[in-house]
């Protein structure tokens, strides 16, 4: 499949934090690590790249081709920081949205994350009293292995049967206040990413070992964002798809960095 054409699109220049070259498998913690152990062994390497305006071409971009899709959706949620309202209103909204866009017959929401940038604070290290911070490192939330593991964790005893059918993990990313002027989301056309650019990395939880992809830099990567993204705009990011053995080469993952700058 052809990559997204960028000729004529408005663009900005931004610094993206890629994985620095390494011979070791990176390890990161999803909880405070033991004393003296770093939150992550992954060293970052900044590269400046053009980030193109997605909005003018959004109608031509789909999950099954680029790994991401911009859709319109107005939520009835009044307070996204109200956990009860979020689960009572937003979860069902998201289920119906995903069914409508993907044609899925069954959708399960397994968790959510609220992020709000606080200047000078690093994600996770901030502690529970501070909101989760934008992820400033280029990454992919799931690998081909961890996607199956996530399914087994969410559906014990049922995962094997579910995998007889097509299963996908899709992030629903939206602003809870708009327009977004600080730390917008940037996504990469999955067709511009080679398998060798992806580095499987351990993500340690208290009760299990997860796996994500860190990403090595390539000038071939094609990045996009939605300028001043509105609360009625939603970016869908496909992290895993059981229909494909190599989700990157087949265009089914999104690479994320959330400090795109203007």
Where are these regions (language model features)?
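Non-heme Fe(II) oxygenase catalytic core, chiefly the N-lobe of the double-stranded beta-helix
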Residues: 2, 6-227
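Catalytic core of Fe(II)/2-oxoglutarate
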Residues: 213-262
């Amino acid at each position: 499949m052809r990559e997204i054409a960028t000729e004529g699109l408005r663009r900005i220049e931004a610094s993206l934090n890629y994985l620095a070259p390494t011979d070791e498998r990176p390890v990161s913690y999803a909880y405070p690590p033991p004393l003296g152990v770093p939150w992550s062994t992954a060293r970052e390497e900044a590269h400046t790249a053009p980030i193109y305006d997605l909005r003018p071409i959004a109608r031509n971009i789909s999950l099954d081709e680029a790994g991401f899709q911009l859709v319109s959706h107005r939520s009835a949620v009044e307070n996204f920081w109200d956990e009860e309202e979020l689960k009572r209103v937003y979860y069902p909204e998201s289920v119906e949205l995903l069914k409508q866009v993907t044609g899925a017959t069954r959708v399960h929401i397994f968790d959510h994350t609220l992020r709000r940038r606080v200047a000078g604070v690093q994600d996770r290290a901030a502690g529970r009293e501070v909101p989760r911070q934008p992820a400033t490192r280029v990454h992919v939330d799931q690998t081909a292995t961890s996607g199956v593991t996530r399914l087994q964790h969410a559906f014990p005893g049922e995962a094997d049967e579910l995998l007889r059918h097509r299963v996908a993990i899709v992030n629903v990313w939206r602003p809870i206040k708009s327009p977004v002027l600080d730390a917008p989301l940037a996504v990469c056309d999955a067709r511009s990413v080679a398998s060798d650019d992806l580095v499987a990395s351990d993500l340690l939880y208290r009760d299990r070992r997860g796996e994500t992809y860190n990403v090595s830099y390539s000038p071939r990567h094609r990045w996009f964002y939605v300028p001043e993204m509105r609360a009625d705009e939603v970016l869908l990011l496909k992290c895993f798809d059981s229909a494909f053995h190599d989700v990157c080469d087949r265009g089914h993952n999104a690479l994320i960095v959330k400090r795109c700058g203007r």
